[in-house]
């Protein structure tokens, strides 16, 4: 989180988002800086950090493995990693303001057709963030995403067999923290080769 992004840390960059995969070293401290963009943070490992803002506020943060958080941009601060081990974090920077359009959720919305395994982690004017749980070799119900675009990030290495309406079936292999970009509405379903959780960030 505090390391200066190297070119190979940028895993996805388009008109909508820039996604960074960062490995923070123990005891890392940053100079005074700000993040211009609002971000969705996905913690792949436990983290204990302290943020010291220019206005004097001190914010001690404790994050669990797999936790997801909203991080608004704009405030000048320094950061310090209090951990004695490395920690991986995925940062999804949002490049655009909300579209202002009503968020579309139809009858086949994943939260409706698979409510046991798909939960809304949080939602605001910019995003709806879903936590999707897959059992090994169990196909999820066919469902639809009607929003403009989305980023999917697995919390573990996984192979997914994906069935998409109007397209050929395909197999997708993703490493933990590797983002996958999808644009436009889609009707699909997936089956994972292992028990896994995926974080889906739907853009508004």
What residue spans do the PLM features occupy?
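Short acidic-glycine-tyrosine-enriched beta hairpin
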Residues: 12-16, 55-73, 166-185
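A short glycine-rich, His/Asp/Glu-containing loop-to-beta-strand
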Residues: 6-32, 36-44, 92, 112-152, ...
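Ligand-binding loop in jelly-roll beta-barrel domains
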Residues: 73-95, 148, 157, 183-204
């Amino acid at each position: 989180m505090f390391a200066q992004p190297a070119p190979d840390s940028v895993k996805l960059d388009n008109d909508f988002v820039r996604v960074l995969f960062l490995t923070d070293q123990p005891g890392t401290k940053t100079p005074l800086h700000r993040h211009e963009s609002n971000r969705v943070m996905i913690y792949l490992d436990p983290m204990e950090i302290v943020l010291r803002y220019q206005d004097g506020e001190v914010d001690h943060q404790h994050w669990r493995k797999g936790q997801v958080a909203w991080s608004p941009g704009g405030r000048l601060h320094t950061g310090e990693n209090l951990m004695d081990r490395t920690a991986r974090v995925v940062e999804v920077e949002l490049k655009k303001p909300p579209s202002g359009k009503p968020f579309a959720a139809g009858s086949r919305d994943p939260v409706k057709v698979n409510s046991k395994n798909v939960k809304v982690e949080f939602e605001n004017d910019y995003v709806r963030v879903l936590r999707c749980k897959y059992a090994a070799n169990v196909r999820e119900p066919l469902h639809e995403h009607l929003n403009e675009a989305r980023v999917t990030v697995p919390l573990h290495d996984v192979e997914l067999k994906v069935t998409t309406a109007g397209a050929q079936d395909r197999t997708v292999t993703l490493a933990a923290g590797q983002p996958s970009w999808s644009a436009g509405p889609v009707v699909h379903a997936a089956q994972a080769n292992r028990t896994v959780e995926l974080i889906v960030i739907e853009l508004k």
